[in-house]
């Protein structure tokens, strides 16, 4: 069915759950995974450039460290399950394009990603990046949604 699954992550809890699901699917299929996180480039929104001399370098260091942290979590999940895993941090202006390009460039035959991530109001129904990947990708997409609480769990919580 699938031999190589791409698992995008933004470090959110739902993204981590999607990675676990993707790793479980890969294990069941005897597939491997590639985990990708996308770092957007530094942008200057202020006209006072003298205040920003160190900002691009600091931003780059921060984003590299954050990406490494997200990828390390995913690699550990895959290692515990015994699933072969590659990890990549891609810098790109548009995360959805980076996800699609990574899937194509690395020969992935499926993308499994969370229904939404960290990005504000647009993430309430279906994340904007997820929607763009669904709209533009020729690689099949599996969208992971957080499971709803069971009636027993809801009753126990009240």
Model regions: which residues?
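A short acidic, glycine-rich active-site loop
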Residues: 54-69
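Glycine-rich, Arg-bearing micro-motifs that act as flexible, cationic patches
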Residues: 110-136, 150-154
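Short, well-ordered secondary-structure micro-motifs
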Residues: 18, 45-48, 97-100, 123-125, ...
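Small/aliphatic-rich secondary-structure junction motif
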Residues: 3-54, 77-86, 158
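Short, hinge-like loop/turn segments at secondary-structure boundaries
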Residues: 50-54, 103-106, 129-130, 157-158
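Structural beta-alpha unit
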Residues: 76-111, 148-158
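Solvent-exposed polar/charged
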Residues: 27, 104-105, 135
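Short, flexible loop segments at boundaries between secondary-structure elements
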Residues: 139-150
């Amino acid at each position: 069915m699938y031999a190589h699954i791409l698992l995008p992550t933004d470090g959110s809890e739902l993204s981590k759950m999607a990675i676990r699901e993707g790793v479980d699917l890969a294990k069941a299929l005897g597939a491997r995974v590639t985990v990708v996180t996308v770092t957007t480039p530094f942008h200057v929104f202020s006209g006072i450039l003298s205040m920003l001399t160190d900002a691009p370098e600091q931003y780059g260091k921060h984003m590299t460290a954050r990406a490494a942290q997200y990828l390390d979590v995913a690699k550990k999940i895959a290692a515990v399950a015994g699933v072969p895993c590659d990890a990549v941090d891609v810098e790109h202006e548009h995360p959805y394009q980076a996800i699609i390009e990574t899937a194509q460039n690395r020969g992935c035959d499926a993308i499994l990603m969370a229904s939404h991530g960290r990005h504000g109001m647009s993430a309430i129904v279906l994340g904007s990046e997820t929607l763009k990947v669904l709209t533009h990708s020729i690689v099949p997409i599996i969208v992971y949604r957080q499971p709803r609480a069971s009636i027993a769990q809801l009753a126990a919580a009240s």
